UniProtKB/Swiss-Prot annotation:
Annotated TM spans: 236-255, 267-284, 296-324, 411-434
Protein's name in the database: 5-hydroxytryptamine receptor 3B
SS bond list: C151-C165
Entry's free-text remark on domains: The HA-stretch region of HTR3B seems to confer increased conductance to HTR3A/HTR3B heteromers compared to that of HTR3A homomers.
Keywords: Cell membrane, Disulfide bond, Glycoprotein, Ion channel, Ion transport, Ligand-gated ion channel, Membrane, Postsynaptic cell membrane, Receptor, Signal, Synapse, Transmembrane, Transmembrane helix, Transport
Glycosylation sites: N25, N92, N134
Phosphoprotein listed as a keyword: no
GO cellular component, one term: synapse
Species for this entry: Rattus norvegicus
Post-translational modification: N-glycosylation is required for membrane localization.
Location relative to the cell: Postsynaptic cell membrane; Cell membrane
InterPro entries: 5HT3_rcpt, 5HT3_rcpt_B, LGIC_TM_5-HT3, Neur_chan_lig-bd, Neur_chan_lig-bd_sf, Neur_channel, Neuro-gated_channel_TM_sf, Neuro_actylchol_rec
Gene behind this protein: Htr3b
Length: 437
């Protein structure tokens, strides 16, 4: 009986021992210990040292975070993938409970020294310390990164500009005989992959072209893969806030030409338009990107619009000046004529008065007084008639001069309209041409 109980106790202990295996005896732990026990991460993982390790790269742009035109920097968020083969990290999966893939610390294995040549700031990406390794030794290192890279940003066609920024990947130390590069996906698939891009931002992703070439230098030949991120600015917000108000102000200035050229309110109106445009330009100056390399077309557009407004105001001022100078000179003439007639009449009466007193009798003088009064009255009527006639002539000349100014104003308006139309066509053509390049 005691023997029976002893056998039963041994069986229960054996069953419990097999039901709860120790962690050190698990297949995953045995596999990890076997792979890393004599692994040297300082050595490139190949059995034949003359054979190059090929690193396959892939890139997927997620968003454009910032475009710094003044400092010529582009900040993008992307998903970056590296795949290479480690000949020292392969195993027979049938010996380890059919384990096909495991995760290992990146710090414990060899990793290629791939960098981006256009880096200008510290890489901002989450720290992912693990990589996946399959039974054939293929290592997958996938991680999201934020890249701040140098880029030659051209703002000549703003806000219809297209930017082409390159990201060049290569090994910083190993030549092409040690580390070669390749594409993880087809190049056409990389170029047209826009599924994960955020289209609600200011920029629109057009394509991501990729090329492979070997850079030759004195230190050796290095394999390089270049990804060209082509993005286009969404111009609607800038068209609404910058271009349309400017166009409206120019149309209002064109409408002021329908006011009479002798109307003083025309100058006041044009002055208000010019002041309003100046205030608008100052308030919107921060919306236009500033680049030391070139002046954008929209900056030229603002400058030319202001120059046209100043030219329009100057033309109206000159027309008013010519009109009132002619009117002032014509108004002085009848006053001089009237003053000359009065002086002649006074001298005539003065010379006549002494002679009448010496030669005529008192009776005749009594009958001569009414006659002299009528003559004086007649002379006054003649003077008034001459003055009115002169005024009519002045008014007629003023009307004729005003008609000439009106025709001249219409001619200047047509020239102004032709210049504005030619400038608009030229600007639109340049915008269309540069937006396609």
């Amino acid at each position: 009986m005691i023997l029976l109980w002893s056998c039963l106790l041994v069986a229960v202990v054996g069953i419990l021992g097999t039901a709860t295996p120790q962690p050190g005896n698990s297949s995953l732990h045995r596999l990890t210990r076997q792979l890393l026990q004599q692994y040297h991460k300082e050595v490139r993982p190949v059995y034949n040292w003359a054979e190059a390790t090929t690193v396959y790269l892939d890139l997927c742009v997620h968003a454009v975070l910032d475009v710094d035109v003044q400092n010529q920097k582009l900040k993008t968020s992307m998903w970056y993938r590296e795949v290479w083969n480690d000949e020292f990290l392969s195993w027979n999966s049938s010996l380890f409970d059919d384990i096909q893939e495991i995760s290992l610390p990146l710090s414990a294995i060899w990793a290629p020294d791939i960098i981006i040549n256009e880096f200008v700031d510290v890489e901002r990406s989450p720290d992912l310390p693990y990589v996946y390794v399959n039974s054939s030794g293929t290592i997958r290192n996938h991680k999201p990164i934020q890249v701040v890279s140098a880029c030659s940003l051209q703002t000549y066609a703003f806000p219809f500009d297209i930017q082409n920024c390159s990201l060049t990947f290569n090994s910083i130390l190993h030549t092409v005989e040690d580390i070669d590069l390749g594409f993880l996906r087809n190049q056409e698939d990389i170029e047209n992959d826009k599924r994960s891009f955020l289209n609600d931002s200011e920029w629109q992703l057009l394509s991501v072209t990729s090329t492979y070439h070997i850079r030759q230098s004195s230190a050796g030949d290095f394999a390089q893969i270049r990804f060209n991120v082509v993005i286009r600015r969404c111009p609607l917000a800038y068209v609404v806030s910058l271009l349309i108000p400017s166009i409206f102000l120019m149309l209002v200035d064109l409408g002021s030409f329908y006011l009479p050229p002798n109307c003083r309110a025309r100058i006041v109106f044009k002055t208000n338009v010019l002041v309003g445009y100046t205030v608008f330009r100052v308030n919107m100056s921060d919306e236009v990107p500033r680049s030391a390399g070139c002046t954008s077309l929209i900056g030229v557009f603002f400058t030319v619009c202001m120059a046209l407004l100043v030219l329009s105001l100057s033309k109206s001022i000159l027309l008013i000046k010519f009109l009132y100078e002619e009117r002032h000179s014509e108004q002085e003439r009848p006053l001089m004529c009237l003053r000359g007639d009065s002086d002649a009449n006074e001298s005539r009466l003065y010379l006549r008065a002494p002679c009448a007193e010496d030669t005529e009798s008192p009776v005749r003088q009594e009958h001569q007084v009414p006659s002299d009064t009528l003559k004086d009255f007649w002379f006054q009527l003649q003077s008034i008639n001459n003055s009115l006639r002169t005024r009519d002539q002045v008014y007629q000349k003023e009307v004729e001069w005003l008609a000439i100014l009106c025709h001249f104003d219409q001619l200047l308006f047509r020239i102004y309209l032709a210049v504005l139309g030619l400038y608009t066509v030229t600007l639109c053509s340049l915008w269309a041409l540069w937006s396609r390049m």
